[in-house]
Amino acid sequence: MMCEVMPTISEDGRRGSALGPDEAGGELERLMVTMLTERERLLETLREAQDGLATAQLRLRELGHEKDSLQRQLSIALPQEFAALTKELNLCREQLLEREEEIAELKAERNNTRLLLEHLECLVSRHERSLRMTVVKRQAQSPGGVSSEVEVLKALKSLFEHHKALDEKVRERLRMALERVAVLEEELELSNQEALNLRDQLSRRRSGLEEPGKDGDGQTLANGLGPVGESNRRTAELEEALERQRAEVCQLRERLAVLCRQMSQLEEELGTAHRELGKAEEANSKLQRDLKEALAQREDMEERITTLEKRYLSAQREATSLHDANDKLENELASKESLYRQSEEKSRQLAEWLDDAKQKLQQTLQKAETLPEIEAQLAQRVAALNKAEERHGNFEERLRQLEAQLEEKNQELQRARQREKMNDDHNKRLSETVDKLLSESNERLQLHLKERMGALEEKNSLSEEIANMKKLQDELLLNKEQLLAEMERMQMEIDQLRGRPPSSYSRSLPGSALELRYSQAPTLPSGAPLDPYGAGSGRAGKRGRWSGAKDESSKDWDRSAPAGSIPPPFPGELDGSDEEEAEGMFGAELLSPSGQADVQTLAIMLQEQLEAINKEIKLIQEEKETTEQRAEELESRVSSSGLDSLGRYRSSCSLPPSLTTSTLASPSPPSSGHSTPRLAPPSPAREGTDKTNHVSKEEAGVPRGEGPAVPGDTPPPTPRSARLERMAQALALQAGSPEDGAPPRGSESTPDSLHKAPKRKSIKSSIGRLFGKKEKGRMGPPGRESVSLAGTPSDETLATDPLGLAKLTGPGDKDRRNKRKHELLEEACRQGLPFAAWDGPTVVSWLELWVGMPAWYVAACRANVKSGAIMANLSDTEIQREIGISNPLHRLKLRLAIQEMVSLTSPSAPASSRTPTGNVWMTHEEMESLTAATKPETKEISWEQILAYGDMNHEWVGNDWLPSLGLPQYRSYFMESLVDARMLDHLNKKELRGQLKMVDSFHRVSLHYGIMCLKRLNYDRKDLERRREESQTQIRDVMVWSNERVMGWVSGLGLKEFATNLTESGVHGALLALDETFDYSDLALLLQIPTQNAQARQLLEKEFSNLISLGTDRRLDEDSAKSFSRSPSWRKMFREKDLRGVTPDSAEMLPPNFRSAAAGALGSPGLPLRKLQPEGQTSGSSRADGVSVRTYSC
């Protein structure tokens, strides 16, 4: 910047007036000259910007021409590559948009420059005087340079602010001066008034002194005495007062004179200010006139520029049109040249034939001896000419037929376009409603889009066929003209030969005409344009194509259609034979008279599919409403009914089919795969899942009330007496076990201990004492930090010693209390009491020792629950309100434990946890065979069989199982929610995302396959640990590999630097062994192996295939990488697996009444109730999957 600091501007207005008028005029002229030069320079910059804009536009047009030429070349070279042409068109559009943005930026810069000029001229016209002084001083300081636009703007801005302040100061001083003059005038008037008053008083006093003097003289004369001394004294006083008044009057007069002089000075200053103001106004008016003239000139220039731009644009348009016309003419010229060359070749051939004919004619004239032979030959040639004429007439009729068909195809093309427009409008209207649906509706709309692309391809093929027909027609017309010319020539030759006039043989041709006609035949295209008239394979192929698309659209709900049924979306994906078939398909079918019917069937099929979508939307809405109503009714029924009686179980199993199929729809997403106990009514957030459940019901293909029973939901009732005595024996062993351990450290038992309590030694559950490793004390591991809610102080201690005085008691008291609780449970099991008949202390002991609920929940149950019947009949809201369990996962844990105990202690429970089929629950046939083989006296059951793996509690899940899956980052959330192995199969997507913070979908997939691994092992923890130890050093049994074992395998391949990337990734053996879609590329992506490291990727691919083939039951598809297949999403994959047996296995873990009476509120995703199998059916047919699951307790 040349000047950052503004020069000092004198605030004295009289200094500027000291200059003479000539000097002021010269400075003004110099100022105007500089301003004009600045304006011209800015106009030059504007012109340069406009020139740059014009060059950019010219470049844009050149690029447009280049784009058009490239498009023409592409259309000529690759007319069938629609996908490539579409990509090129998109690129050209993007470039055009970029050029338009550049043009908009240039226009904005031009507008900014125009606004800058207007603002500059406005400032100059308003502040000419200040600008003149500033420019004069700046030129005096730096005479060598001219300031830039930025400096001029800064100077104008500062001058405007300075002179605005100066104007305000001058006005303020003038106002103060006028006020002071007014005050002084008032004071002068007051002083004059006082002087007049003093004069009056003085005159009155003088007259008063004279009168008393006369009176005194008379009295003196009369009396001989007078007050002469007193009068003299008063006169002296009055004279002194008069002198003082005179002095004051003199002072006032002096002040008045001073004020008058000041007033005159102010008037002079005011006059000079008025004169300066008049001069400034004149200069301002002059500058305004100049500005108006400049604006008028600029408007004229702009008008001229706009007219020039319009002329330029019109010239450019004309040039483009001329270029297009030139291109067309060049194309036509090329085609004409090719036709001309062909005609020249034909003329040469005709000349050769004519020479041959002349030679033959000469030979015949020389050799002709008799005229009858020549006449016979002529008669033969006339007959051949007649035949040629007949064939020519047939050919003309064929041409007329082709023209009629061409017109029909044009009309059909118009109708197809109208139908396409109608379909577009209908699809637009439909898209407003289909946007509210879930992913299935979106996929169907994508299918419709593919069908529309097929229709566009057909339209393009139709236009190509029309062009081919036009070319064929032109060639036929040309051949016709050539034939007529040849006929005339041959007739003239015949007339010359016979010596007759040309009119006598107008319908005759020589024998070479037939050769000419057949020699021209090969010039016609011998390919596909004429063949499809008699071919039916094209139509059959097209029917197969559309039928395949229709089948795919009908199978789009379950995604079970093979990948081969999906038609390729673009012609570029077809191979050679497919392209020929597609060409025959579109050309023959659309050019044949029956092609219109196929177009109509396509439109009808689209309309039917759209109507089906609308009907399905209505059905889904009705289903949602009925589901909500029935869920509310069922919730009221569940809250008022018990779950302990066999009759109620059978009545609930005999619900009407409509209720069993509709009211038990799950409010959880399909990714959960099974029911999640929830008693809340369906919320609007889960409407989409209701729709998917409705679709899955339709996929199952089972009518309401007639379908086969789904196994694994509701087990049959069996006796309970045999296993209860064995339960009592197991409890007795547990009560006498020496491994009870020391009691836990006492601490305050509040819900905040979920987050704030330090690690404590937990009370070992009864099952852990029974079936844990005998050589280890089963207290909480000291080195493992966990939220041990089950290990808080007992509820009795809290109830009897709320101040924490129980800490002073020894471990013997705690052992005695635990022994007393075990004795209560042992007594209940020995008596064979169902869970509903348990008393309050037994239920509390069960909650504390077996379920592992926190102490404050146990205390709340002690206060509110007095028997097992109350506990069994508690609804979800009552559990939350009465016991105070606000966490829904804690409520889920309690409900699952209650239902498990109700099923284990009910009279209809199975006599053994292992049945002939290997499952926990049994069919009627198994139950009858078992009751027939079992004596009524056996009333004991081994708790080693039922709860043999009951130590899979929330501590095992958080400390052992989740790290083995590679998901240790979710440990704290699982521990806080008390998630044990019983709850794993009942967690839905909402709970995983919300409370367990498992937002990553891949981590949810990993968790799902970990649960599937546990289910395949029957939740056998010892078996899992044994198999992991056996496969620690060998490549076998990959399904049980932990995340650490997978990392070790990767390190053993020589990829140790990438193995650490699998930490907290969710990669484990069950994912590798059970997920059919997981391949080496996914593993390389998780290992973060760069794509440039081809050697490492090849090694990983080889070893991964060896691992899958040796250690799993999977078989890698060799063509999977080559063939394009569209696999369903993992949600739908889970749903299909649920239908194949995952959900029945998860349902087998629940007791009968849990599915029947509470299923309306708890929900099961897309599965009806399992009905009781009638006698006579085999148990194997009622099983959807052979995987058996053991019941466990945590």
From Swiss-Prot:
Residues 1-23, 201-233, 522-588, 624-817, 1157-1194 are annotated as: Disordered. The modification Phosphothreonine is found at T714, T792. One of its GO terms (cellular component) is synapse. Its main location: cytoplasm. Detected in sperm (at protein level). PROSITE patterns: SAM_DOMAIN. Residues 838-904, 953-1017, 1041-1110 form the SAM domain. PANTHER family: LAR INTERACTING PROTEIN LIP -RELATED PROTEIN, LIPRIN-ALPHA-3. Belongs to the liprin family. Liprin-alpha subfamily. This is Liprin-alpha-3. The lineage of its organism: Eukaryota, Metazoa, Chordata, Craniata, Vertebrata.
